[in-house]
Regions:
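Bacterial Sec-dependent N-terminal signal peptides
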Residues: 14-41, 198, 230, 519, ...
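Hydrophobic, small-residue-rich alpha-helical packing segments that form membrane-like cores
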Residues: 181-238, 243-266
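Short acidic-aromatic linear motifs embedded in glycine-rich loops, typified by GG[WY][YF]DAGD(H)
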Residues: 21-156, 160-171, 176-193, 261-357, ...
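Insoluble glucan recognition modules
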Residues: 356-451
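Short coil/turn linking the two alpha-helices of tandem helical-hairpin repeats
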Residues: 169-170, 176, 235-241, 524-527
Length: 631
């Protein structure tokens, strides 16, 4: 599929069955027996054709994970949309490195790709094919347009086409705009023209899509149009030179006020509801209520070497146990750089203690587990109510006691190790180093010592992995990312008993992103509310920390904070390159990461790398097209 004008009809390609319990409810169509009239004879048959439009973003061909690929000249597994989105939007940034030596792959993180790169070409072909499928569906389904359900189908196909063009505009900028089946060579459109098309399509279909939450899981409703408009307008100033932050705020608000909501269901009981978003049962564990547009995967019925199968397998290696992630083996590929790890940083103990309230008291902690040791002085606690005290403190392995005014005349330990204070009692053991929240209640003569819950979004495997990277081809250099897993909330492996293919669905747009769009647009001059922005970000951080201990105030909210929060919340979800470009950090020397510009410590690169080259084959076929600058 080497030409956007080489229109492949859905009728000629046939259909793959992507029907499964968590996918579009459709009857599979035998690709060897149907005719065009059969496929579009009624709404139910048309729904099968619509499934192919959706599946063009999830699957790679007509014969399971390999055998009859939609796109040639690249390994079929590499050709899946979200796998290529990872390669172009995450691997090119501080979020990811990969160990493999496939030709052209290391060029992406090193930022020295050229025209003809297999991966930049294949993404163009994949998106062009999605446009082709959508165009074919829209034209052929028009004959059934009197059926209300088919009207919804057409609006959904238009959304998928707009989403494909959104990505073509982001990645390649200047592409042909093709909306009808045609054999004529199209002219080249610029970014403004593509932007205008995507905007007009989304605005037109917002009231033609189903209402919020009324469509079946796996199909979009009008909130998807609002959320994509939110993303579009956030990038408008970067792409077309015109700020559209008020519009970003408006459509973000529509999405935020819809039936979708942030998942707060900690179904596996580990203290945070964040990880549920990326488990094998994320279509039913509560995460689905946050997913506005997602790719559905099923380890038995919609197999691919892309999607979450890639994200999970490629990130497992070294001393990691594949079974812990619901798979049969790791591919020893993807890791992250210290830049992402350091976004989570160390807890600000001073800020945590300021959040306690109350006043500094004469009671404190002493012991070899404290920073000052047994010789003191005591680390003073805060009196939060009469005879009630609290403190965040970093402790080492050892022992502590409570002491008054640096004087052993009044001290408390715990002789029975039962949480009860005893005057002059035994030392209180601290088994593991870390940050703790310590309380003392002299009204009831009790105390608590609880580990501080850090940001649960920091999902890294560090055993045998170095933080520093000197050779990207070595899997043990760089922390492994454990964000995606093929296990459910009960720890059970996905439906593929072999452990080869994942059930985990992949969110392409979720409500958390819209929250962050709103905050950034407000800070950039949009007519949103700073108070609302803080509240929405604190929703995300409360989920991440399992409490309000990580919450921020308006004084903490600035553009760089939002960028870092986007990194913490959305890493490996296909947005990082676009974010860095919007902030002016992608190609510049002002923000570096390991092997940016193919140098160990990173270096700036030419600004033309903000967009990728058009495929040489496309330009050779179509004399109307010019290569992007720099290539």
């Amino acid at each position: 599929m080497k030409n956007i004008t080489y229109i492949i009809s859905i009728i000629l390609l046939g259909f793959v069955s992507v029907s499964c319990q968590k996918d579009l409810d459709q009857n599979p169509i035998d690709p060897d027996s149907f005719t065009q009239q059969d496929v579009f004879a009624n709404a139910q048959q048309a729904k099968g054709a619509l499934a192919k439009v959706y599946a063009s973003l999830a699957l790679t061909g007509q014969q399971g994970p390999a055998g009859q690929p939609d796109i040639s000249d690249i390994d079929e597994g590499f050709s899946q949309f979200s796998r290529m989105l990872f390669n172009l939007n995450e691997l090119t940034t501080d979020h990811a490195v990969i160990a493999w030596g496939d030709p052209g792959l290391q060029d992406l993180h090193g930022m020295y790709w050229t025209a003809g790169n297999d991966f930049t070409d294949a993404m163009y072909y994949r998106l062009a094919q999605t446009v082709s499928f959508a165009n074919s569906f829209i034209e052929n389904a028009e004959d059934l347009n009197s059926d209300q359900e088919v009207k919804y189908f057409i609006a959904e196909a238009r959304f998928i086409r707009a989403y494909a063009y959104y990505n073509l505009m982001d990645l390649y900028a200047n592409v042909p705009l093709v909306t009808k089946i045609s054999t004529e060579l199209p002219t080249q459109s610029n970014r403004q023209e593509i932007f205008d098309f995507v905007e007009s399509e989304l605005l037109d279909i917002q009231d033609k899509l189903k209402d919020s939450g009324t469509n079946e899981y796996g199909r979009v409703d009008k909130v998807a149009a609002w959320a994509l408009l939110s993303r579009l307008y956030l990038n408008a100033e970067t792409w077309i030179g015109t700020p559209r932050y008020n519009d970003c705020v408006h459509f973000s608000e529509l999405a935020m006020n819809s039936s979708y909501h942030i998942n707060t269901n900690d179904a596996n009981g580990n203290g945070s509801a964040y990880d549920e978003l990326f488990l094998a049962d994320n279509n039913m564990n509560g995460a689905q209520n946050e997913f506005i547009f997602e790719l559905n995967f099923d380890g038995q019925h919609s197999q691919t070497y892309g999607g979450t199968t890639f994200l999970i397998h490629a990130a497992v290696g070294g001393s990691m146990q594949p079974g812990d992630y619901g798979i049969n083996g790791g591919w020893f590929g993807s890791r992250t750089t210290k830049n992402l790890v350091n976004k989570f940083g160390n807890a600000d103990i001073s800020a945590l203690n300021n959040s306690i309230g109350g006043t500094v008291s004469n009671w404190g902690l002493v012991g070899d587990a404290t920073p000052n040791g047994w010789s003191g002085p005591d680390v003073q606690m805060y009196e939060t109510a009469t005879n009630e005290y609290a403190l965040y403190i970093e402790l080492t392995s050892g022992s502590i006691k409570f002491r008054y005014d640096n004087n052993w005349g009044q001290n408390y330990g715990d002789t029975g190790a039962d949480g009860t204070l005893d005057n002059g009692g035994d030392n209180i053991a601290i088994a593991n180093p870390g940050i703790y929240f310590v309380t003392m209640d002299l009204n009831n003569m009790t105390y608590t010592i609880a580990p501080y819950k850090s940001d649960a979004r920091a999902m890294f495997y560090t055993d045998g992995q170095s933080l520093e990277i000197t050779d990207v081809s070595q899997f043990n250099e760089g922390y492994a990312v454990t964000k995606f897993k093929n296990i459910d909330v009960n720890g059970n492996q996905g439906s593929d008993s072999s452990g080869s293919f994942a059930d985990t669905d992949l969110p392409l747009i979720r409500l958390a992103e819209v929250y962050l769009n709103y905050a950034e647009a407000t800070l950039r001059g949009g007519n949103g509310s700073i108070s609302t922005a803080v509240d929405k970000i604190n929703e995300l951080r409360t989920r991440a920390y399992g409490s309000n201990s990580g919450n921020i105030t308006a004084s903490d909210l600035n553009l760089d904070f939002v960028l870092d929060e986007r990194s913490r919340e959305l890493y490996w979800e296909g947005l990082r390159r676009t974010d860095l470009i919007r902030y002016g950090y992608f190609t510049s020397g002002s923000y570096l990461w390991p092997f940016k510009g193919n140098e160990a410590n990173g270096t700036g690169v030419d600004s033309y790398r903000k967009i990728f080259p058009l495929p040489n084959n496309v330009i050779a076929i179509n004399p109307n097209l010019q290569q992007n600058p720099g290539y």
